[in-house]
Amino acid sequence: MVAPLLVFLFSLQLCHTTSWAYVGGNSLNSNSLHASYSEFPAGTSNEVPEDAANGQDDNDDSQLTEPNDNNAPLVQSIDDETEMQFPKPIQWVSIDHLRNSIILRFQNPTPKILNKLDPEEMKRLRSLQENAMRWGKRSYESYPLNRNGLADKSSVGRMGFLSNHQVIRDSRGDNFMRFGRSVGGSGGNDDNFMRFGRASGSSDFMRFGRAGQDNFMRFGRAAGQDFMRFGRGSGQDFMRFGRSPGSQDFMRFGRNPGSQDFMRFGRSPGSQDFMRFGRNPGSQDFMRFGRNPGSQDFMRFGRNPGSQDFMRFGRASGGQDFMRFGRAPSGQDFMRFGRPDNFMRFGRTPAQSSDFMRFGRTPTQSSDFMRFGKSLDKSENKTSDLQK
């Protein structure tokens, strides 16, 4: 009894699987996705049968009539070719993976603007006398007044242009960077220079080359203002950094406007703080760092304003704290550190001829100190101590 029942169940299972295999159509058209949809006539509608809608069949038939997304084709292959034409050329194509779309960007043709100069201006620039190569804003940007809506002179005035007969001129053309000769022509003030910046009236610019009868290279403002200049000045050969040499702070390399050769850093040599290398405005050769050598704190290398050769660090020698290397003001060679009363001195003593090196104070009476050096006898040594 069990064996015939099993055979009957297997036969039912086989019939069920074969019925699922022939749902989409016959075996001849099973590989064509479009064939299953082309079998229906044009007027028919894909509706569920009435018996399936009323639920009269069994459960197996109802499962067959339910819509199944797995059985629907994902891509429908259509034999017809589609051709699209666009009025503008495509600039680039991109794919949006989030939206599953293709993005096309078209080119916007820009209107052609007539930005040519006047024929007379072009003829003048092409001449041999006007050998100029310029970068930046041009002195003349000429456009016809009857093109691109620029015929209205009031609208042109609001744009910042100046109307002149048939063309408009850009008043902002003075700010440019120019290489070569000036635009003035071969006569007059024609100079051979290379200029960066604004016009040469009184504005801020940086210029390389010759100026009015001078051979120099200048960076900065006009001649009466703060600038940095390389080369010859008005009759002098120097290189100067900073303001004018009247009474202001500057740094100058080269010859003095007088007749001396020096290199100076700082303010003017009247009574201010400066650092100077070279000859003294008097007649001496020295190198000085600091303030005026009258009674202020400075550091000087070279000869003394008197007639002695020394190198001094600190304040003046009138009783203040300083450190001096070189000869003493009385004509002797020593090296002293500290104040005149409490100091450390290396060298010869001013009163004696003995050679020693002494550490300590020098009061009118004997004190505790440590002295290194030779002496002729003890009496001279004691008198020297009392004198100091």
From Swiss-Prot:
One of its GO terms (cellular component) is extracellular region. One of its GO terms (biological process) is neuropeptide signaling pathway. It comes from the Eukaryota. Residues 22-172, 375-388 form a propeptide. Residues 64-74 have a biased composition (Polar residues). It is found in: Secreted. Residues 1-21 form the signal peptide. InterPro entries: FMRFamid-related_peptide-like, FMRFamide-related_np. Keywords: Amidation, Cleavage on pair of basic residues, Neuropeptide, Repeat, Secreted, Signal. Residues 374-388 have a biased composition (Basic and acidic residues). Belongs to the FARP (FMRFamide related peptide) family. This is FMRFamide neuropeptides.
